C-alpha cells in the first residue's frame, strides 16, 4: 500500500548508527514493496563520532548496490535550537572540531551536497575505509 502513495523519493533519516538494524530493515521492507528511490538525511556534529557518519554513508552506498535502488544521502550539520548556540552556526559537537566540519563541508561542496550511487565515486570522495576518511578530515 505504501508503494502506491505517490511519494518519490521516499524520505527517510539515518541519524544514529545505533539504529542501523531498524533502518536497514525499514529500507529493505520498502524496497520489497516496490519503492526504489530514497532521499536520506544524515545528521552529523551531534553526539556521534565522525567515523559514525562515514559508516552511515557507506551503508547507504552499499545498500544501493545490494538492492539496486537509489538512495541520495544528504548529510546535515546539527545546530541546537535551544541554549547559547541557537542563534549562530558555531556549535561544535563533543566529538567534532572545526577542522572536521570544514572538511566534511568541503567534500559535500564537491559532491553538490549529496551522496548517491556508486562505490568508486564514494570512495574517491570519502575514502575507502575509516582510516582514509579520518585522513581526509585532518588534511
Model-derived features: where do they sit?
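Flexible glycine/acidic-rich beta-alpha junction loops that bind and position SAM and/or redox cofactors
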Residues: 44-51, 67-134
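Long C-terminal interaction/binding lobes of large macromolecular proteins
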Residues: 138-139
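Conserved AdoMet/S-adenosylmethionine-binding subsite of the radical SAM
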Residues: 1-86
Amino acid at each position: 500500500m505504501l508503494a502506491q502513495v505517490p511519494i518519490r523519493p521516499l524520505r527517510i533519516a539515518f541519524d544514529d548508527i545505533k539504529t542501523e538494524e531498524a533502518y536497514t530493515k525499514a529500507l529493505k521492507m520498502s524496497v520489497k514493496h516496490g519503492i526504489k528511490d530514497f532521499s536520506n538525511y544524515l545528521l552529523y556534529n551531534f553526539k556521534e563520532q565522525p567515523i559514525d557518519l562515514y559508516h552511515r554513508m557507506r551503508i547507504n552506498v552499499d545498500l544501493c548496490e545490494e538492492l539496486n535502488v537509489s538512495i541520495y544521502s544528504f548529510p546535515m550539520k546539527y545546530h541546537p535550537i535551544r541554549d547559547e548556540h541557537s542563534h549562530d552556526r558555531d556549535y561544535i559537537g563533543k566529538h567534532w572540531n572545526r577542522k572536521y566540519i570544514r572538511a566534511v563541508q568541503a567534500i559535500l561542496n564537491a559532491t553538490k551536497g549529496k551522496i548517491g550511487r556508486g562505490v568508486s565515486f564514494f570512495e574517491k570522495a570519502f575514502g575507502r575505509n575509516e582510516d582514509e576518511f579520518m585522513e581526509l578530515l585532518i588534511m
